[in-house]
């Protein structure tokens, strides 16, 4: 059948949006790859999506206001760039404030890496993140597990990385954390915790901060953020060996991004 000029134009118009979608997808994938290659989190775990393996625990220890959440968000964004789902559990911090952390860190990361901060790139990451909030006084690990189970079993959201931000380690947690360890292995999740320490507090018997010492055996990785003068040092307490060329890591006080002190 002979196509008229009008028919050919109409067919081309239908193909054009599809071609643009493909081109846009490739461009977004290229930007993601650039961010992964230039992400400062790779100093901790290489260019993999996470420092931990399935079923493992990691802790970021520091005093209040030093940068625990900022480092957590960098780890989460690295996982999201690899298209792996993240659940960020925040205690006593509303969804909009947690989301603001992600927007600010993503903006700093994009600018530092020289990658255009396009709205499409940001929007492509959001399906891989779920923010869950609790009031600290009503929170319990079993309650969190119940909500996570509902999400996973109904296939609403299946996380590979779980962040628990704001849980107090000043109270006994061994039994609850042991149960969560089993839960994370069952569902193939890696779990990161922020652990708040206190000024002028003696370390535990192992030399680790008191908040970690009673449950240290449950953690495969522990990182401490230590203010020294105007710098915030990133110190590995357990489970990681930094590359020789990146052995001195700090948090940039302006952007709160991990950076190589010697760079």
Regions found by a protein language model. Name each.
Residues 130-186:
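Phosphate-binding/switch loop-helix module in NTP-utilizing enzymes
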Residues 196-263:
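Phosphate-binding/switch region of NTP-binding enzymes
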Residues 165, 190-199:
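Structural recognition of the conserved hydrophobic beta-strand(s) that form the central parallel beta-sheet
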Residues 53-58:
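Pre-Walker A (Motif I) flank of P-loop NTPase domains
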Residues 39-51:
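Pre-Walker A adenine-sensing motif
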Residues 68:
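Conserved lysine of the Walker
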Residues 71-129:
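Conserved P-loop
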Residues 63:
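P-loop (Walker A) phosphate-binding loop of NTP-binding proteins
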